[in-house]
Regions:
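Positively charged n-region of N-terminal signal peptides that target proteins for export
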Residues: 27-40
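A residue-level marker of the well-folded mature domains of exported/periplasmic proteins
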Residues: 14-24, 51-356
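Bacterial N-terminal signal peptides
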Residues: 39-48
Length: 356
C-alpha cells in the first residue's frame, strides 16, 4: 500500500505536467494568433495590390461612355451593337447606359456626371435636349478633358469634336418625295404623326416631309398635323382612329419615329391596308407588314453605322487624330420588293451582321 506522502508526490508531479501542458498550449495559441495576424496582414496587402493592379488595368483598358437618347426603342439597341463592334475592333470597352424616357433631361445629366466622376476616356451621346445638355457636356470636355461626340442628335453648341447623325430634315423630304410618287397628282389628305413636340429629330423629319409635299404649291395635297403621340403606340393608335372618324377620306399617313410607326400600323391594319403608309424607323415587328404591303414603304436609318462611326470618331480623338465635324448617314427606303435583299437586311438586322 502506497503512503499518502507518495500519493501526494505523484499528484504533484501530475499537476506539474498539467501546468507544462497548459503553458505549452498557451504558447501555441499565442503562436497561432501571431500566425493568423500575419496571414491577415499578408492577405490584406495582397488584396490591396490586386485592387491597385485592377484599377490600373481598367484605366489602361479605356472605357468609352455611350449614352443613347433613351432605351425605349429597338433602334437604340441597334445603335448599341454598332458601338460595341467599334469597341471590339479598336480594343476599347463600351459602357452603354441610358434613361427609360427620351425626355428625361435630369436623368441624362446624372449619367454624364457619373461618367465624369469615373474618368471615362470619351462620351458619345444623343442629347435629349439640345440646349439643356450643353453645360454638363461642356464641363466634361473643357474642365475634365473628356472628348464629347454627338450621336444621332443635335447640340446647340460648337465644342463637340464631331456629330454623327441622320439628316432628319432631308430624311423627311425623302419620305415626302416617295409619298408624292405613290399618290401622284390626285393627292389627298395626309396625316403626319410625330412623337414629342419640340423633339429635334422627329420635328426635323415632320418638317422635311411637309416642306416636300407643299414645295410646289400643289393644292391637291392637304397636310393634317403634325400630331403628337409621345412615341407611344397606343396614344398614336387613338390619334389615328380619331382622325379617320373626322376624315373618312384620309388617303395616307406618315409616321416620324419607331413608336409612332408602331401605333399608326395598328390603325392602318384596321383599315385593311387601304391607306398609303410610310413609316420612319421600322422595327423588327414591322418587317412582315412591309412584306405584306400594309406598310407601303419605310424609311430606315442605319443605327449600326451611326453607333459605329460615332464611337470610331471618339477613339480617333482619344488617339489624337482629326475627325470630320459633321457626318450625315444616309437613309434607306424599304418596300415589299427589296426588304429581303442582302444590302437591306444589313441595315435592318445588324445583330446578324455582327455575328458573321
Amino acid at each position: 500500500m502506497r503512503s499518502p506522502t507518495g500519493c501526494l508526490g505523484a499528484q504533484g508531479r501530475l499537476v506539474a505536467e498539467l501546468v507544462k501542458i497548459v503553458n505549452k498550449n498557451r504558447e501555441e495559441k499565442r503562436t497561432m494568433k501571431k500566425l493568423l495576424a500575419l496571414t491577415l496582414i499578408v492577405c490584406l496587402a495582397l488584396c490591396s495590390f490586386a485592387a491597385v493592379a485592377q484599377a490600373e488595368e481598367q484605366t489602361d483598358e479605356q472605357v468609352i461612355a455611350v449614352i443613347p437618347k433613351s432605351l425605349l426603342y429597338d433602334y437604340w439597341q441597334y445603335v448599341r451593337i454598332g458601338t460595341q463592334q467599334a469597341g471590339l475592333d479598336y480594343g476599347y470597352t463600351i459602357d452603354f447606359q441610358g434613361t427609360a424616357s427620351d425626355t428625361d433631361l435630369e436623368g441624362q445629366i446624372k449619367l454624364v456626371e457619373d461618367f465624369i466622376q469615373r474618368g471615362v476616356a470619351a462620351i458619345v451621346i444623343s442629347p435629349v435636349d439640345p440646349d439643356g445638355m450643353i453645360p454638363v457636356l461642356q464641363s466634361a470636355q473643357e474642365e475634365y478633358g473628356i472628348p464629347v461626340i454627338i450621336m444621332d442628335g443635335k447640340l446647340n453648341a460648337d465644342f463637340p469634336y464631331s456629330t454623327v447623325s441622320t439628316d432628319d430634315h432631308a430624311g423627311g423630304m425623302f419620305a415626302g418625295e416617295k409619298m408624292i410618287e405613290l399618290l401622284g397628282e390626285e393627292g389627298g389628305k395626309i396625316a403626319v404623326i410625330s412623337a414629342v413636340a419640340g423633339a429635334v429629330q422627329e420635328g426635323g423629319r415632320a418638317q422635311g416631309f411637309i416642306d416636300k409635299i407643299t414645295e410646289n404649291g400643289n393644292s391637291n395635297y392637304e397636310i393634317l398635323g403634325p400630331f403628337y403621340g409621345d412615341g407611344d403606340r397606343f396614344k398614336t393608335h387613338n390619334i389615328l382612329q380619331d382622325l379617320l372618324i373626322a376624315n373618312p377620306d384620309l388617303k395616307a399617313v406618315f409616321s416620324c419615329n419607331e413608336g409612332s410607326s408602331a401605333g399608326a400600323l395598328l390603325g392602318v391594319e384596321e383599315e385593311g391596308g387601304a391607306l398609303t403608309f410610310i413609316a420612319f424607323d421600322p422595327n423588327a415587328d414591322m418587317h412582315d407588314s412591309i412584306r405584306e404591303g400594309i406598310i407601303t414603304g419605310a424609311v430606315a436609318q442605319n443605327p449600326f453605322l451611326i453607333g459605329y462611326t460615332a464611337t470610331e470618331n471618339a477613339i480617333k480623338v482619344i488617339q489624337g487624330e482629326e475627325v470630320e465635324k459633321q457626318i450625315s448617314v444616309p437613309v434607306t427606303y424599304v418596300t415589299a420588293e427589296n426588304i429581303d435583299q442582302p444590302e437591306i437586311q444589313n441595315v435592318l438586322n445588324p445583330e446578324e451582321v455582327i455575328e458573321q
